[in-house]
Amino acid sequence: VLYANNLEFDNVPLGQMIHERTGLPVYVDNDANVAAWGEYCAGAGKGSSSMVMVTLGTGVGGGVVLNGKLLTGCNGAAAELGHFVIDMHGKECNCGMRGCFEQYGSVTALICQAREAMAAHKESKLWALAENEEANVNGKVILAAYDAGDETAVQVVNTYVHYLCVGVTSIINI
């Protein structure tokens, strides 16, 4: 693993380590690249010559297949879709830049936004659903509060969806 900023890995020979322990052949690649290739070969992208896949989780990832070839770049990080700027004065990203899509469009960002909103809105249903512990806030809690019509959760989800739209529209236009 050359670099994984969300895992704090830097030049870790993960494939070799797993191979040595299991004796099995191991191929390590970017998770979003592998997911995109799988969708291209056997899923939603099957039959297309080109496609883009966006993954949302701890961060924002992506994989791009162009004319039947997975774009990997010189170090396997050709489609780091979470690291283009959508707010140049925005939050600092762990990559060192400010306002990256990942800081607004990841599930981690959604949870952080909900926790910040909870601090200002003690009446929010988010508190009860999270058993009065910010640490218990996750996507399910946020969406349950949203479905229940909680104003704080509705505002958080609407803001999150706005940033998703900005980010995905930018990806489409690239």
Regions found by a protein language model. Give the residues of each.
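ATP-binding/phosphotransfer module of carbohydrate and carboxylate kinases, centering on a glycine-rich
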Residues: G15-L24, G38-S49, L70, V85-I174
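Short, active-site-adjacent cap segments at secondary-structure transitions
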Residues: V34-A36, G61
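Short glycine-aspartate micro-motif
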Residues: Y27, S50-T55, G61-G63, N94
